[in-house]
Structures are given as C-alpha cells and as structure tokens.
C-alpha cells in the first residue's frame, strides 16, 4: 500500500474512533436506505440458516452427515469420483428386512412378507434420494448462489460505502484546513458508493419473487416425494392384506411330535480316550514389531462405504495418517483405508 493509501486508512480509523469513543456525529443515511440495509441483512441470515436446516431436514443424522462429508473430501483429495450418497434410514431398514427374509425362506409367512416390505423400503429410499437431489438443485444451490454472489456483492458495496463515509466525515471536520476540491471529491465518492449500494439492495429486494419460486420448488419436490411414497406403501399394503387373507383361509396345522429316541447301553469299557473329550489351546497371536505408528482394534469394524478399512478385534493396524478428530487412515494385510478413532487403542502414536 502506498504512503497516501496508508494515510487515508489512518484518517478513516481516526474518524471511527472519534465516533465510537468521542461521540462525534457521522453523516447519517436516510431511513429508506437503513430499512433496505436491514432487510438485506435479514435475508442474508435467513438464507444461511434455512440452507443449514434444509440439509438437516433431508439428512437428519449428524454422524452420517459428518462421515459423508469426510468420505467426499477424501475422494476429492484422491482425485476419485464423488463418494456414496447419504445412507437413507429406509435403505438401512430395507437391507435388514431383505436379509432376514432370505434367511427365513419362502416356506413360511413372515419371510416372504419381510421381502415384500423390504423391497418397498428400498423403493422409498430411492425416492428419498431423488428428493435430496431435486431440493439441492432447485432450492439449496440457488440460495447458495444468492449468498455467494448477490449478497456478498452488496456487502462489498456497503463496506466500501462505510470507508468513503468515514473519509468524507474526516475531511469535512477539517474543512478550511484542506483544499475545497479534496472535500468535494470525497463527497462525490461517498454519493457514488451510496448510489451503487442502494441500487444493488433495491434490485435484490425487488426481485425476491425468485426466492418465492425456489420455495415453491422445495414444496413441489416434497409433494412429489409423498405422492410416490403413498403409492409404494399402498401397493405393499394390498399385497400384505392378500397374504393375511390367504393364510387365514388355510387350515391350521397341528403339531405332531416325533417318536422319542431310545437309549442303548453298550457293554464293556469305553475305548474313547478321555471319555471322548478333547481340549485344544487357542494359539496366541504372533508378536508384532512396534517400530512404527500402530494401534490395536478394540472391536470389530465392518466397512460400510468404499475406502473404509475393516478389521477384527485384536488386529494390529499400521497408522499412516489422521484424517480428522474422528478418523484415522491405516493399513492391514496390505489393504489401506480409513476407520473410526474410537474403535482402536493407540500403541505407537503418529508423529506430530
């Protein structure tokens, strides 16, 4: 910064201190300007909080959101494609129902019913994914653009206006000690900045129907989601009711006990050593060289997403990096991946 620039900054700071501490009166902006400034400030705060709350509404599990964010960050660092989406609760429920439905098999009522409801839950999770994408594209992204572009630009104009206002008030206070032309130029710059800031705020507030359109897109996306959800649930309800009707119309089977086993006593001494019992000691795990950062698994960890490292309780994992306060990156059996910190105990810490 030039000497003249430093001098101007010093003058502005002097004027600001004299207003805050000394009670000096600065140039007042008109009420219309102040009201527009207030509305723009409220709009800015509303946009930020509504974006945050919308994401929490669509993805209510904070741990899953944090994990998803970490996975996407790691994928970006490694130059990989975007990681998996948010794990919908419907998808997790569907997975459990389908799994146990297969295990029970088709020769009972509960197993096939679990399969039908599990498939419906899977369809619901896909519809929920579509809702997430629709809301992001037509509601969250436009609000983010409004915040990053228009609102940020207005804040820049207001900051510049405040700087020029301080410069003008400082020179006005020194009227008679500085050339009139210098004071006139300061006033012109102040008026110019006020016009630009006023115009940008006016245009934003005048075009707020765009935000109404974005709200409409949010509501329409939810309406479409609930329509599809109702259709899926109605279809599975019909199938379940039909299954109940068929089961009720069939005669109930009676339990038929099988013949009891008879016990035959053998004569003579038993030839089985130790009465047929044997005991095998469990081998101890081989020793591990503790010459590099490593940790011991406290619990089993089953990877749920690409890039995670699975292990069993007692495994010794070589540490390569700490991703954040919740995740490590390490290697086990030649495989590399990341895992939660609270699943392990440190044996040799990573160097700081």
Swiss-Prot record:
Q: Which residues carry this modification: Phosphoserine?
A: 262
Record remark on domains: An N-terminal amphipathic helix, the BAR domain and a second amphipathic helix inserted into helix 1 of the BAR domain (N-BAR domain) induce membrane curvature and bind curved membranes. The BAR domain dimer forms a rigid crescent shaped bundle of helices with the pair of second amphipathic helices protruding towards the membrane-binding surface.
Q: Where is this region: Membrane-binding amphipathic helix?
A: 1-21
Q: Where is this region: Disordered?
A: 1-27, 264-289
Q: Where is the BAR domain?
A: 18-249
Instruction: Kindly name one Pfam family recorded for this protein.
Output: SH3_1
Give positions of region: Binds and tubulates liposomes. 1-125
Q: Does the keyword Cytoplasm apply?
A: yes
The coiled-coil regions, if any, are: 181-248
Q: Where is this region: Required for dimerization upon membrane association?
A: 60-87
Q: Name one GO biological process term.
A: dendrite extension
| Name of the protein in question | Endophilin-A1
Q: Which UniProt keywords apply?
A: Cell projection, Coiled coil, Cytoplasm, Endocytosis, Endosome, Lipid-binding, Membrane, Phosphoprotein, SH3 domain, Synapse
Role played = Implicated in synaptic vesicle endocytosis. May recruit other proteins to membranes with high curvature. Required for BDNF-dependent dendrite outgrowth. Cooperates with SH3GL2 to mediate BDNF-NTRK2 early endocytic trafficking and signaling from early endosomes.
Family (UniProt): Belongs to the endophilin family.
Top-level lineage group: Eukaryota
Q: Which residues form the SH3 domain?
A: 290-349
Q: Where in the cell does this protein reside?
A: Cytoplasm; Membrane; Early endosome; Presynapse
Q: Where is the composition biased (Polar residues)?
A: 268-281
Q: Which residues carry this modification: Phosphotyrosine?
A: 299
A single Gene Ontology MF term assigned here is: lipid binding
Matching entries from CDD domains are given as: BAR_Endophilin_A1 (cd07613), SH3_Endophilin_A (cd11803)
The top of its lineage is: Eukaryota, Metazoa, Chordata, Craniata, Vertebrata
